[in-house]
């Protein structure tokens, strides 16, 4: 069959849309890259001889025919009879976004980048003289729909359409049958975007609007453009680097004009979504592409961009900065990157199809402006190590904190306020050794000096805050003690102030006098840590029992709670003993022996001190949440034991024992009982014990100051230490009984059970020696 017969439509069959059309008139209508068409009609007039193009571009024609055969675009006999000129590649790729009729929107919404298999163009093979000639021919001769010639389907089942009617859109990010990604949404064409950017929407087929002669890319104005962004357009890029999965494209005319100023840029792959230029929301603008510098035509909203080369655009250091983006609400946002930026005063719209790189920035500075929209001086809030632009960045959450109150902005600049450790109110200073407010300071002083017996109406776990701190004085007082408030801390503070004042007075002396004296003032010797000061530091804190006061009291439950509290206090006493200066120099067996013999002495003496300081010796203050009142004393087995312990608290109250005296006496009670055979390091033990006896004498002198009364007080205090033996022995006897008598069902903690089990044989055999100050 004659090949011309194949090109004629069958009789009686209407023209099939989507098929290439040929007639006997001069010229051929050619369709190339069927999967990459945007509704563009291309006509090759007879004045352009195909034989010449075929001779000069034989290698290009063969390469192009292979591509058509691979993609199923060749028709039966079409490749042999209709040779393809070289200008097809240039028109298909380069003018796909610009060509069309002058009275019709040329860009359809389904323009798509073909994949690598669909484009077979090598660098250096583009002829721009043919391209300009084809543009001139297209302007002179445009195809009308009624002049198109129809043919039926070819034997290969391939259909083509050369009509100028737009194709159905797939939407942005969609794909057609050839898996190519569309550039624009279906409700937007190229000229709509160019009109938004301020570019004239006239048809690029106009001779005055030739894209290759556009003054925007003149050599003179290349300096006014942002040089990295000038080459960001894929139509003006060099051919050294393109994105992975695509071949290079070289447009020599464009690169000659920008060769001195343009740098290489990575072209995004076809399957990556194209970033939107800008997104206008309620009263602010989101910049989605770093290559867009836009000046709005309405209102006080504006943006100015300063850019310099980044890793994508050359070897320069990355620096992107967008300053002064203000909104009608008065907010201002500031994005700042490295300092090596090039300011640009000529704000021209630059359309960049390349999406931003994966890492362009290293920091993010955000500032807020208040007042008027035009004259707001932003302050910087730095967020280091945070990327500004990324692939598909849409600026989420910018408006979440856009309107800070004046109080918030003022307080954020200064240090955070200090809070009271008791009620979490704003602290007024350090009172009684703890950072508290004035209200808790006064409350604690009155509670201690007034000797109030506070009881919690709940479960000793009331919430103490700024609003509810007056609801429960017992829990508030317990929290004060837990925080570490102590009336003795006030005296220590006064001592420190006296030392500082004496040091300041010495420093203010005349230079002549200070030169003759030693460089170390006399007050420095008082700053040397003493044994008393060290004992103050290592003193254990007050522990809580966790006793539930809401449940009716029983002897079994109350004693079990006291034993559990005693076990924890023994653990605390072991840590305290190891921190005593000189105690760890003893043999390890001696340390364990002294603790096993003296644990009850330490517990009772500390209980008497707490009862004396908190209740003036009227009731037993085991813990802030466990106080033995008169009602609890009348329980079985409680009356006699509590009366013995109250005697110790009463003696302390009558003698008005100071804190320094209490600390020294407590260490002496640790060393008041030893085995009959003595200790392994007995000499060292005697030396340490005598050292703390002398410290007790120093504490007495420090308190009294009169030598005639010092010995009397020393006698009274040592008599109190001797009386502790009788009280401790009676309590130990009852403790051993309750431990051995399982019918009482009194619980003991593990550590306390171990100590009692080891101590019972020693006491029963009488293998102990009391170290008394006075003979009976």
Swiss-Prot record:
Keywords: Chromatin regulator, Cytoplasm, Cytoskeleton, DNA-binding, Lipid-binding, Metal-binding, Mitochondrion, Nucleus, Receptor, Steroid-binding, Transcription, Transcription regulation, Zinc, Zinc-finger. Residues 1-25, 47-86, 394-415 are annotated as: Disordered. GO terms for cellular component: centrosome; chromatin; cytoplasm; mitochondrion; nuclear speck; nucleus; spindle. Residues 1-419 are annotated as: Modulating. Its main location: cytoplasm. Expressed in liver with relative abundance. Residues 403-413 have a biased composition (Low complexity). Pfam families: GCR, Hormone_recep, zf-C4. A zinc finger (NR C4-type) spans 420-440, 456-480. GO terms for biological process: cellular response to glucocorticoid stimulus; cellular response to steroid hormone stimulus; chromatin organization; nuclear receptor-mediated steroid hormone signaling pathway; positive regulation of transcription by RNA polymerase II; regulation of transcription by RNA polymerase II. Residues 47-83 have a biased composition (Polar residues). It is found in: Cytoplasm; Nucleus; Mitochondrion; Cytoplasm, Cytoskeleton, Spindle. Residues 523-757 form the NR LBD domain. The keyword Acetylation does not apply. GO terms for molecular function: DNA-binding transcription factor activity; estrogen response element binding; nuclear glucocorticoid receptor activity; nuclear receptor activity; steroid binding; steroid hormone binding; zinc ion binding. Residues 486-522 are annotated as: Hinge. Residues 420-485 bind DNA. It comes from the Eukaryota. SUPFAM superfamilies: Glucocorticoid receptor-like (DNA-binding domain), Nuclear receptor ligand-binding domain. Belongs to the nuclear hormone receptor family. NR3 subfamily. Receptor for glucocorticoids (GC). Has a dual mode of action: as a transcription factor that binds to glucocorticoid response elements (GRE), both for nuclear and mitochondrial DNA, and as a modulator of other transcription factors. Affects inflammatory responses, cellular proliferation and differentiation in target tissues. Involved in chromatin remodeling. Plays a role in rapid mRNA degradation by binding to the 5' UTR of target mRNAs and interacting with PNRC2 in a ligand-dependent manner which recruits the RNA helicase UPF1 and the mRNA-decapping enzyme DCP1A, leading to RNA decay. Heteromultimeric cytoplasmic complex with HSP90. Upon ligand binding the complex undergoes a conformation change and moves to the nucleus, where it dissociates. Binds to DNA as a homodimer, and as heterodimer with NR3C2. Interaction with numerous other transcription factors modulates transcription activation. Composed of three domains: a modulating N-terminal domain, a DNA-binding domain and a C-terminal ligand-binding domain. The ligand-binding domain is required for correct chromosome segregation during mitosis although ligand binding is not required. This is Glucocorticoid receptor. It comes from Xenopus laevis. The gene is nr3c1.
């Amino acid at each position: 069959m004659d090949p011309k017969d194949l090109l004629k439509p069958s009789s009686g069959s209407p023209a099939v849309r989507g098929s290439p059309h040929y007639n006997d008139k001069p010229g051929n209508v050619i369709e190339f890259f069927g999967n990459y068409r945007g509704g563009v009609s291309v006509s090759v007039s007879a004045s352009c001889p195909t034989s010449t193009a075929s001779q000069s571009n034989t290698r290009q024609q063969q390469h192009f025919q292979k591509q058509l055969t691979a993609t199923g675009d060749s028709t039966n006999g079409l490749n042999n009879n209709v040779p393809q000129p070289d200008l097809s590649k240039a028109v298909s790729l380069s003018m796909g976004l610009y060509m069309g009729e002058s009275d019709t929107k040329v860009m359809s919404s389904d323009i798509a980048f073909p994949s690598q298999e669909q484009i077979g163009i090598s660098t250096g093979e583009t002829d721009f003289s043919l391209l300009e000639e084809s543009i001139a021919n297209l302007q002179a001769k445009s195809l009308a729909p009624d002049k198109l010639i129809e043919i039926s389907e070819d034997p290969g089942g391939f259909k083509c359409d050369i009509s100028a009617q737009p194709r159905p859109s797939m939407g942005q990010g969609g794909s057609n049958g050839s898996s190519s990604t569309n550039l624009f949404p279906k409700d937007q064409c190229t000229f709509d975007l160019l009109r938004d950017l301020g570019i004239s929407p006239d048809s690029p087929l106009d001779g005055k609007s030739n894209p290759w002669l556009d003054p925007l890319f003149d050599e003179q104005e290349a300096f006014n453009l942002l040089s990295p962004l000038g080459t960001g357009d894929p139509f003006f890029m060099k051919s050294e680097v393109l994105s992975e999965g695509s071949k290079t494209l070289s447009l020599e005319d464009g690169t000659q004009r920008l060769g001195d100023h343009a740098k290489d840029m990575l072209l995004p792959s076809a399957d990556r979504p194209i970033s939107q230029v800008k997104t206008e929301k309620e009263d602010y603008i989101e910049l989605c592409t770093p290559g867009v510098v836009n000046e709005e035509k309405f209102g006080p909203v504006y943006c100015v961009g300063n850019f310099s080369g980044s890793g994508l655009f050359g070897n320069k250091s990355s620096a992107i900065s967008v300053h002064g983006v203000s909104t009608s609400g008065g907010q201002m946002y500031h994005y700042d990157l490295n300092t090596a930026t090039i300011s640009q005063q000529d704000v021209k719209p630059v359309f960049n199809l390349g999406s931003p790189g994966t890492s362009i920035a290293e920091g993010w500075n955000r500032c807020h402006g208040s007042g008027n929209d035009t004259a707001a001086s932003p302050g910087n809030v730095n967020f280091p190590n945070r990327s500004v632009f990324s692939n598909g960045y849409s600026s989420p959450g910018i408006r979440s904190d856009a309107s800070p109150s004046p109080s918030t902005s003022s307080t954020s600049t200064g240090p955070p306020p200090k809070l009271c450790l008791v009620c979490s109110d704003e602290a007024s200073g350090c009172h009684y050794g703890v950072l508290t407010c004035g209200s808790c300071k006064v409350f604690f002083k009155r509670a201690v000096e007034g000797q109030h017996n506070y009881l919690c109406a709940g479960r000793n776990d009331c919430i103490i805050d700024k609003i509810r701190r007056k609801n429960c004085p017992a829990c508030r007082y317990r929290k004060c003690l837990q925080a570490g408030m102590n009336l003795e801390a006030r005296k220590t503070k006064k001592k420190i102030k006296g030392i500082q004042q004496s040091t300041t007075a010495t420093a203010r002396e005349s230079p002549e006098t200070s030169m003759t004296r030693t460089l170390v003032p006399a007050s420095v010797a008082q700053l040397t840590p003493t044994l008393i000061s060290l004992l103050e530091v290592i003193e254990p804190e007050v522990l809580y029992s966790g006793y539930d006061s809401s449940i009716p009291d029983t002897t079994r439950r109350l004693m079990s709670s006291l034993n559990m509290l005693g076990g924890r206090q023994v653990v605390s006493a072991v840590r305290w003993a190891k921190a005593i200066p000189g105690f760890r120099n003893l043999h390890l067996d001696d340390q364990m022996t002294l603790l096993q013999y003296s644990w009850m002495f330490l517990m009772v003496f500390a209980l008497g001190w707490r009862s004396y300081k908190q209740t003036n010796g009227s009731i037993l203050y085991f813990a802030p949440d466990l106080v033995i009142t008169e009602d609890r004393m009348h329980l079985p087995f409680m009356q006699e034991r509590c009366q013995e312990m109250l005697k110790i608290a009463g003696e302390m109250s009558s003698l008005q024992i100071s804190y320094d005296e209490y600390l020294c006496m407590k260490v002496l009670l640790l060393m008041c009982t030893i085995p009959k055979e003595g200790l392994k390091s007995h000499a060292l033990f005697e030396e340490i014990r005598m050292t703390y006896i002398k410290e007790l004498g120093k504490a007495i002198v420090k308190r009294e100051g009169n030598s005639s009364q010092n010995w009397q007080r020393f006698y009274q205090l040592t008599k109190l230490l001797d009386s502790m033996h009788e009280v401790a022995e009676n309590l130990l006897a009852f403790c051993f009984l309750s431990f051995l008598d399982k019918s009482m069902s009194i619980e003991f903690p593990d550590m306390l059970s171990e100590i009692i089990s080891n101590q019972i044989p020693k006491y029963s055999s009488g293998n102990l020696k009391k170290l008394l100050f006075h003979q009976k």
